Regions:
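Juxtamembrane/interface alpha-helical elements of multi-pass membrane proteins
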Residues: 69-173, 180
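Buried hydrophobic packing residues in well-ordered domains
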Residues: 18, 62-63, 119, 153, ...
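Membrane-helix interface segments
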Residues: 39, 58-59, 138-142
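Interfacial helix-loop-helix linkers and transmembrane-helix boundary segments
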Residues: 58-67
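Structural signal for the C-terminal ends of transmembrane alpha-helices
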Residues: 35, 51-59, 122-123, 246-247
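Transmembrane alpha-helix interface motif
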Residues: 1-23, 27-41, 45-48, 158, ...
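Hydrophobic transmembrane alpha-helices of multi-pass, membrane-embedded glycosylation machinery
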Residues: 46-53, 69
Length: 248
């Protein structure tokens, strides 16, 4: 999970798209999933995301993310079955409405989590920030904050692993199957991680200020991000995906 959103170099059409268009495509898939109400549409959007990942050469990372999300999806399914009392009883406390609602919720969870991660894998964060500033006219401070937060995710993951390894060397066992016990073991790790994050944030803010962060404008970037014909075609496909989600 530490490297799941790291940029994967490539020369595919997906890599060459305008970063804003990539975000639009990911948003269209997510909106389409929320609008869809049939298994065919939900599975279709999920298959489309995996197919795009295979084309971009990052499908193995998507599958690793799916492995992490499946237990959470199963927990959601159990909760839906336990609390949804509408419909006909299938067996025990399970109703047909609860089964249908829970299974669709699981597919939505899996489908919504992947598109944005996929787009981050095929987009450099600097390009994403600069394109949002140039094309969407987002203030640079907001784009910088968003991309910096994404950069800190793998850094904090590595620091968490380092702290856990140090604690394991002292005899702490984190491989327990008891979730409550594991939570009690993980909570104390948040204190050193929080202190480290505050220090890194302060150092980043100081470095940005010394480099004239507040003087940066849309024209400060030397690289341009024009919307080309391929980008327009992908935007049209994105609109079609939203319409398909609404219809199905």
């Amino acid at each position: 999970m530490v490297n799941v959103i790291d940029y994967m170099p490539g020369d595919t059409l997906l890599h060459r798209l305008n970063p804003v268009v990539k975000l639009g495509l990911a948003a269209a898939i997510i909106v389409g999933i929320f609008l869809s109400d049939t298994y065919v549409a939900l599975l279709g959007f999920l298959a489309l995301t995996l197919a795009l990942g295979a084309y971009a050469g990052v499908v193995d990372r998507l599958f690793s993310l799916l492995k992490l999300l499946i237990p959470l999806a199963l927990i959601m399914l159990v909760l839906q079955l336990a609390f949804m009392r509408d419909g006909n009883v299938v067996r025990g406390f399970i109703t047909d409405t609860g089964l249908i609602t829970g299974s669709k919720a699981c597919l939505r969870l899996l489908g919504v989590a992947l598109p944005l991660i996929l787009m981050l894998m095929v987009t450099k964060l600097n390009d994403l920030a600069n394109a949002c500033v140039e094309v969407l006219h987002v203030p640079y401070r907001y784009a910088f904050t968003f991309t910096t937060a994404l950069r800190f995710v793998p850094v904090f993951g590595q620091e968490m692993n380092a702290i856990m390894e140090a604690q394991t060397a002292r005899g702490v066992e984190y491989d327990t199957k008891n979730p409550i016990k594991k939570l009690k073991l993980m909570l104390p790790l948040c204190v050193p991680l929080l202190i480290s994050s505050v220090g890194k944030t302060d150092a980043t803010a100081l470095a940005a200020e010394q480099r004239g962060f507040y003087l940066r404008t849309r024209a400060s970037s030397y690289k341009r991000y024009p919307i080309k014909g391929l980008d327009i075609a992908v935007l049209a496909i994105s609109a079609a995906l939203i319409i398909l989600g609404f219809l199905f």
